[in-house]
Amino acid sequence: MFNHIKILSFLFFLSISLIASAQQTVISKNTLPKRIQAAYEVTKNGQPFAKVHELFVATENVYKIESITKGVGVYALFGERQLTSVGDVTAQGLKPTRFELHQGSNAKRSLSADFDWAKQNLIMTVKGQPKEAPLAQGTQDLASYAYQFMFLPAPLKDAITVSLTTGKKLNQYQYRINVEPEMIDSAGASYKTLHLAPSEQNNTETKELWLAVEYYYVPVRILMVDDHGQKLEQTLIELYVE
């Protein structure tokens, strides 16, 4: 497994070196990766919890993202969590039109969100009941937000606000950006990362990010803390880009 990850990381580095410089500016649709595959290990309060496999595919002006989370050990009993996001690729980045979340075989736990950009209206469906919210420009979903950072002007600095729907509610995450890069070693690869730390205004659920500066700002590490203090840490172990 270690050698497999190391080879993929090496191939990925060669591929990126041919098409992008480390100091990339705003990405255009012409330089957008056609396919990104990422695998993560997740711990809960420091203990093994799950594995995540994600696939981002962009074809001309549309994209599709699939994310599958499988629990390990006793957590496997919860079944797979599947996230799907589809939408358009614009000069400003990803513009979701539909998001779905399915947890195991329990249909009652499914969530969805429809983005009506013309009417600036977000329609979330929870347990079959629609719930509406104002749709602000740049709003993302649980699957798409991780692939939106590549469209932002580089280098990122100062602060950033991420508007994100979970399918159940619409959250705003405010971050302060640490301009000094942090190195993260994971699964035989070393990543230069940009650290997005929650601002002091975030008092409940937080999501902290370390983005790969040289690899389209793909998240290398994500630290999530819910309003009960439970910690989920997601770390990149495999990455491949076409």
Task: Name these PLM-found stretches.
Residues 11-13, 89:
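Extended hydrophobic/Leu-rich segments
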Residues 15-19:
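N-terminal signal peptide c-region/cleavage motif recognized by signal peptidases
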Residues 106-150:
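Hydrophobic, well-structured mid-protein blocks that either form specific transmembrane helices
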Residues 9-10, 20:
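Cleavable N-terminal signal peptides
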Residues 1-9:
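Bacterial N-terminal signal peptides that target proteins for export
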Residues 23-117, 154-242:
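Acidic, serine/threonine-rich low-complexity disordered tracts
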Residues 1, 20-21, 145:
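Intrinsic low-complexity/disordered segments
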